[in-house]
Curated annotation (Swiss-Prot):
Provenance organism: Bos taurus
Xref: SUPFAM superfamilies: Fibrinogen coiled-coil and central regions (SSF58010)
Cystine connections: C455-C485
Assigned keywords, A-Z: Adaptive immunity, Blood coagulation, Coiled coil, Disulfide bond, Glycoprotein, Hemostasis, Immunity, Innate immunity, Secreted, Signal
Renumbered residue ranges of the record's region Disordered: 267-427, 530-615
Subunit description: Heterohexamer; disulfide linked. Contains 2 sets of 3 non-identical chains (alpha, beta and gamma). The 2 heterotrimers are in head to head conformation with the N-termini in a small central domain.
Molecular functions (GO terms): protein-macromolecule adaptor activity; signaling receptor binding
SMART domains referenced in this protein's UniProt entry, alphabetically: Fib_alpha
Protein name: Fibrinogen alpha chain
Domain of life the protein comes from: Eukaryota
Pfam family, one: Fibrinogen_aC
GO CC annotations on file: fibrinogen complex
Residue positions the entry lists as glycosylated: T325
Length: 615
């Protein structure tokens, strides 16, 4: 700011310069005019304080013509200075507050992170424990499921055996009833037998209802879900990683914590279960038949697998996987053979080999692909054809020589398809006007024949008296049931099941006819080879006269089946003794046997009840 004194000095100098420019008097003139005399001097005065505080606004147009005074300039400067000072103070206070809050937040964040780190460690341990427990539980459930499937398969085999035994019982009763009906002699009068076919029918219906029950686990629990845990590469997405690197140290501690991700994998109908899939969880491995590791059940070794007997089940390692080997005891009819599993997978079964292929025993059950829903093939064993030979083991065996039992199939889509179907034919046996249907079995080898005993006996008696007269008497005896054929039984075609052949029967029988008569004929008449070929001996009784010196000649012809035996006896009364029970004690007798082989013909009854012969 210029003072008034300086302003006046400047004005005076300017005026002097203008005066000199306007006239050019000589320098001496200035002095002559009084220029050399000192004039009055400017006196400096003190400026008074600015009393005016409100100054009008000075626009840009007025700036050249009007210049603001010093008081106005000072007031404006002070006003701006106060405004800036207040702003700076506010910013400083805010900065102090923010610094304090930042320190507090950092301390609090550090405490929270420490707490979270402990919680995260506990949660991770809990997750690992949960995974182990879930895997253990899943393995136990798998063991139970496999045991259930194994037991269901055993139940199915037992149900099939029960059904076969029921059919055999019904067939046996019908066979017994047919034999009793065909016997019109003493056996028909002594024994009354009735077959309750309706009861068998009801039992078969109940058994079919029981077999139709699906015992396998449901489809929902066949494929158990699997829990998988994996480590997460980073707790935050990639776009935020750079920001996390610039974050405070307290936040960077989160990167040191290991984060895991838990996924529950479910399997559908096309998926694989944990014990059967290629991708498996921790510590879960399927077993193998040779080396049952984590999935072997053990060996089931029953003793004598017969009625009322039970086997011994020796479990292996109780871990999920395949079943062991089930070995029965005696391979008797109706018993099961060795069950060797194939691949240890759900619903699969191995090869079921029977013992002896006797009636009632099962054949080989070879499954297809041991996957859920696969079907196996049940091949029956070879059963002996019916035989009518004297040394055969059954009389008119009504079991077909090559029965068509159908297929034993196990199918299902996870219910292990275990719907077992067993198709059979039917056996039709006619007796009179009654038709008997046995289950669904079909005779493929022809009609069922039943052998009946019948005989025709011709007795010729020749008596020569002392005076030379000869009396000849012929007597013909015919019997349809063999009851009037005498004490001898020439039933060559009848055999005894489960009793052996006729040789065993002769040894077991205690009848005097088979003991004394056969020995006497072998020793005295020399007909042992003939009787050995026939397999049995036969004779007829003869009568003797009470007159003395009488010559008795007796001839007997017996026609049985396809052979005939003729016996002739020549005796003197004085040499003959009492003949009892066909034993020729001390007698000089000669017996001739003539046999003529004929093809055996079976006798069966027509629907009208009349017997007929079939070649």
């Amino acid at each position: 700011m210029f003072s008034v004194r300086d302003l006046c000095l400047v004005l005076s100098l300017v005026g002097a310069i203008k005066t000199e420019d306007g006239s050019d008097p000589p320098s001496g003139d200035f002095l002559t005019e009084g220029g050399g005399v000192r004039g009055p001097r400017l006196v400096e005065r003190q400026q008074s304080a600015c009393k005016e505080t409100g100054w009008p606004f000075c626009s840009d147009e007025d700036w050249n013509t009007k210049c603001p005074s010093g008081c106005r300039m000072k007031g404006l400067i002070d006003e701006v200075d106060q405004d800036f000072t207040s702003r700076i103070n506010k910013l400083r206070d805010s900065l102090f507050n923010y610094q304090k809050n930042s320190k507090d937040s950092n301390t609090l964040t550090k405490n929270i992170v420490e707490l979270m780190r402990g919680d995260f460690a506990k949660a991770n341990n809990n997750d690992n424990t949960f995974k182990q427990i879930s895997e253990d539980l899943r393995s136990r459930i798998e063991i139970l499921r496999r045991k259930v499937i194994e037991q269901v398969q055993r139940i199915k085999v037992l149900q099939k055996n029960v059904r076969d035994q029921l059919v055999d019982m019904k067939r046996l009763e019908v066979d017994i009833d047919i034999k009793i009906r065909s016997c019109k002699g003493s056996c028909s009068r002594a024994l009354e037998h009735k077959v309750d076919l309706e009861d068998y029918k009801n039992q078969q219906k109940q058994l079919e209802q029981v077999i139709a029950i699906n015992l396998l686990p449901s489809r929902d629990i066949q494929y158990l879900p699997l829990i998988k845990m994996s480590t997460i590469t980073g707790p935050v997405p990639r776009e935020f990683k750079s920001q996390l690197q610039e974050a405070p140290l307290e936040w960077k501690a989160l990167l040191e914590m290991q984060q895991t991700k838990m996924v529950l994998e479910t399997f559908g109908g096309d998926g694989h279960a944990r014990g059967d899939s290629v991708s498996q969880g921790t510590g879960l491995a399927p077993g193998s038949p040779r080396k049952p590791g984590t999935s072997s059940i053990g060996n089931v070794n029953p003793g004598s697998y017969g009625p009322g007997s039970s086997g011994t089940w020796n479990p292996g390692r109780p871990e999920p996987g395949s079943a062991g080997t089930w070995n029965p005891g005696r391979p008797e009819p109706g018993s099961a053979g060795t069950w060797n599993p194939g691949r240890p997978e759900p619903g699969s079964a191995g090869t079921w080999n029977p013992g002896r292929p006797e009636p009632g025993s099962a054949g080989t059950w070879n499954p297809g692909r041991p996957e859920p829903g696969s079907a196996g093939t049940w091949n029956t064993g070879s059963s002996g054809s019916s035989s009518f030979r004297p040394d055969s083991s059954g009389h008119g065996n009504i079991r077909p020589s090559s029965p068509d039992w159908g297929t034993f199939r196990e199918e299902g889509s996870v219910s292990s398809g275990t719907k077992q179907e067993f198709h059979t034919g039917k056996l039709v046996t006619t007796k009179g006007d009654k038709e008997l249907l046995i289950d669904n079995e079909k005779v493929t080898s022809g009609h069922t024949t039943t052998t009946r005993r019948s005989c025709s006996k011709v007795i010729t008696k020749t008596v020569t008296n002392a005076d030379g007269r000869t009396e000849t008497t012929k007597e013909v005896v015919k019997s349809e049931d063999g009851s009037d054929c005498g004490d001898a039984d020439f039933d060559w075609h009848h055999t005894f099941p489960s009793r052996g052949n006729l040789d065993d029967f002769f040894h077991r029988d205690k009848d005097d006819f088979f003991t004394r008569s056969s020995h006497e004929f072998d020793g005295r008449t020399g007909l042992a080879p003939e009787f050995a070929a026939l397999g049995e001996s036969g004779s007829s009784s003869s009568k003797t006269s009470t007159h003395s010196k009488q010559f008795v000649s007796s001839s007997t012809t017996v026609n049985r089946g396809g052979s005939a035996i003729e016996s002739k006896h020549f005796k003197m009364e004085d040499e003959a003794e009492s003949l009892e029970d066909l034993g020729f004690k001390g007698a000089h007798g000669t017996q001739k046997g003539h046999t003529k082989a004929r093809p055996a013909r079976g006798i069966h009854t027509s629907p009208l009840g009349e017997p007929s012969l079939t070649p």
